[in-house]
A protein has these predicted regions:
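Nucleotide-activated sugar donor-binding and catalytic core shared by glycosyltransferases
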Residues: 1-288
Length: 288
């Protein structure tokens, strides 16, 4: 947004129609930007249904259109080809430590040590690491060390794998939306530089950081899945939260139920087509 808004001002002054796709997270921080977006753009297209409600509640919704999330289409394609569940008596734990090398350096040691704790307590866990294609294999091997020989590594499409697994440990971000689409109980971990974390605490105005929790919130700010942030993100806590899902079927089922409800915030398949139609409508004068 700090780049796009000045650009949008220049385009608007030049008479170039501006459509914001997607809406910045004004509902989470720096909400004053919403009026600027409304003034500069012909329209704002949102991924999540609650974002449209947020704009409506502030009298800014007349030119906001909820188009839905393109991941829904991707999920429909991937989930159409199911992955086998673990063998009887086995539990599958999936790790998604992020897509950027910086995230991997912060989170993979945490997940490595957490799986070591779990392996020392129980012998029924199969660990699968989803490696983003943007992450060098050498970096993963360097950090994972001997644990790599006990893990299965996958890259590429993985939503069907998530849907056929028991628990996901995941970096906060878009990957939690993938977990929501797969309706898998998850433990969300988040570590950033201390200064970034302190600034975030001052600026961010929502109780949860994981999109999976924000989307599945029934309205009371409660968490569907645990978030372990900064100092709370320790190997012991991660292992503890994973075992709570593995050993409490009712808790896991409730998480899946709430995640399924949260999927409704993403819309039905067809988001790319709806987005294109909305942009064409706005350019034809469907909104100011």
């Amino acid at each position: 947004p700090d780049f796009h808004l000045p650009l949008a001002r220049r385009l608007a002054r030049a008479g170039v129609p501006v459509v914001f796709y997607v809406s910045p997270q004004v509902w989470a921080w720096r909400s004053g930007r919403a009026k600027t977006l409304s003034r500069l753009g012909r329209g704002i297209l949102t991924l999540f249904r609650f974002e449209k409600r947020w704009y409506d509640a502030r009298g800014l919704g007349s030119h906001v259109t909820w188009v839905g999330h393109p991941l829904v289409d991707e999920a429909a394609r991937e989930l159409a080809v199911p992955v086998a569940r673990p063998q009887e008596g086995r539990r599958r734990l999936v790790l998604m430590p992020g897509s950027r090398p910086g995230e991997i350096r912060k989170l993979l040691p945490l997940l490595r040590d957490a799986t070591a704790i779990l392996s020392s307590r129980r012998s029924d866990i199969d660990v699968v690491l989803v490696k983003a294609e943007s992450v060098p294999e050498e970096l993963v091997a360097e950090i994972a060390g001997d644990a790599l020989s006990r893990w299965t590594i996958v890259s590429g499409p993985h939503l069907a794998l998530l849907a056929a697994s028991d628990v996901l440990v995941v970096a906060s971000g878009t990957a939690t939306v993938e977990g929501l689409l797969a309706e898998i109980p998850m433990v969300v971990v988040y570590r950033v530089a201390t200064l970034s974390y302190l600034l975030g605490k001052l600026l961010v105005k929502v109780p949860n950081v994981a999109m999976a929790n924000i989307l599945s919130d029934p309205g009371d700010g409660s968490q569907t899945v645990p978030e372990l942030i900064q100092g709370a993100a320790t190997p012991e806590r991660v292992a503890e939260e994973v075992e709570r899902f593995l050993d409490d079927p009712a808790r896991a089922a409730e998480a899946r139920r709430r995640l399924a409800l949260g999927r409704e915030e993403l819309g039905a398949p067809g988001a790319p087509d709806r987005t294109a139609d909305a942009i064409l409508d706005l350019l034809r004068g469907g909104a100011r």
